[in-house]
Amino acid sequence: STFYNDGRTSLYGHILNEGTFDFYNQTGVLRLVGNQLQDISGQEIFTTNFYLENSTSQVAFQLKTTLHIYRDADFNLGILENRLSGGTINFLDEAWAYQANNLSFVDGPVVKFGDHNFIYPIGHQNYYRPAGISMLASENIIEATYFLENPGGLYDLQQKEGLIERIDDREYWQIDMENREETMLSLTWNSNTTPNYILNQTSTADAIHIVYWNPIIQRWEDKGGLTNTDENSVTTAIKRSGIYTLALMKYDEVNPCEIVVFNAVTPNGDGFNDVLEISNEEASCARNLEVKIFNRWGVKVFETDNYGASGQVFDGYSSGRLTVQEQSQLPSGTYFYVLEYDYEQGDGLRKHQKAGYIHLSTD
């Protein structure tokens, strides 16, 4: 059988799709409503908009097929589980998830297609624990899953870089990317799931970073991070699939080469702050100083792998493989930077990542 939904379709029981469930015009909404467990199975389902309202506690929906959402998903009430049921929920390029909360989220992986920014409506064990990605330079497929589990059972928490004081031992996120394209990743902390040794330091500058488990060298790596206490989040740039979580840093030692970023840039030719100035007095300490700058949407506007050499400095103009026009002057505003460099530690070469804000004035 064939069913095309361009209107409002409400389903109150189990769904077994044995034919075509699709749409012609992007006007329809598929509503799943009830007070008992609803299974979603059979052939894949395509819908423009998606609405959940089921008062069943714990799991309200079990997704056993593939669900494609093209516009809006409204998580009004009811947890949708696909962690064990094996289904897939795909958000297409312009799709967005609304109202996710502890009573309504996806317990399992969520896939985002395209290049738009997105907040993943994910969680586990009755807690909504989102992750966010920025706008991308080109289309990608990125999947995110949250685990309310100690990562140490699989990824040794004692194997870590020296600047990492203590790793979140109650939760982690798995991020899988089809293409190794850089994106800004935002993770959140929550008093119900995040350990107190992290919560107690969220207002301390440079105390909370995102860390990544490097499967090749079997060690946790510091990926840096900029905290936002209004949103209970920390953000940094990533380009690898894998396991990420929060960590408390040795914040009194978090700048191993004493790199200083003067974050005001006013390229007006007066000789003061015409370019982004980065003080690297211990040049023998920091090597291969890589600098990336992103606008407020997470689009990369500048990149160099050897800042300061051969005139490679940020002067308010975009450069690199970007989605904004190359070598065009950027508008005034606040930008986000990520520095990465190599430095010597007792047992060999280490890599450090630092993040922060730049204030650009081109008026």
Regions inferred by a protein language model and the residue ranges of each:
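Self-processing/autoproteolytic domain segments and adjacent N-terminal interaction modules in large
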Residues: 1-37, 42-49, 54-56, 72-208, ...
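Beta-strand-rich extracellular passenger or scaffold domains
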Residues: 59-63
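Residue-level detector of buried hydrophobic side-chain packing
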Residues: 80, 185, 210-211, 244, ...
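Beta-strand-rich interaction surfaces with strong enrichment in secreted/lumenal proteins
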Residues: 172-176, 235-236, 301, 326
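Short proline/glycine- and polar residue-rich coil/turn motifs
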Residues: 177, 227-230, 306-310
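Exposed aromatic-hydrophobic patches
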Residues: 186-188, 231-239, 312-319
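Proteolytic cleavage junctions
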Residues: 199-207, 213-273
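Short loop/turn motifs at secondary-structure boundaries
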Residues: 254-363
